[in-house]
Amino acid sequence: MSRYVINVTQYDDMQDLLCAADILITDFSSVSTEFAVQRKPCFLYAPDYDSYDRGLYLTPDQMPFMFAETEGKLLCNIRTFDESKYTVAVDKYWNFLGIKEKGTACQAVFNEMNKMLWHHTQE
């Protein structure tokens, strides 16, 4: 295995791994959407796509991730990855899904709580 690839199969907390990873290669798991919150590169690899019988909520062309059914196509997708196009595609994906997260939720909650507390002390 490459020194750039670490086998983390036995690691318990996937969320820690998503934060630590530089890129993600997955199939049609919902982990792709969770990972995309960080705007880090995510690639779909599904060599069994034609026989995928569980059904999908979205098709690969509805997602912002480059899709491959072969290792060769996956490597090509990684080599030709364009971060600016990916960022635009992820923003469109969030809009399509109705996600409004901008990375400022904690600040917005703090501001609202501060206004409520300030208003309460003025009464």
List the model feature ranges, each with a label:
Residues 1, 30-98:
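Catalytic binding pocket for nucleotide-activated donors in carbohydrate/polymer assembly enzymes
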Residues 1-33:
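Donor nucleotide-activated moiety binding/catalytic core segment of transferases
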Residues 6-9, 66, 98-101:
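Pocket-edge positions in alpha/beta enzyme catalytic cores
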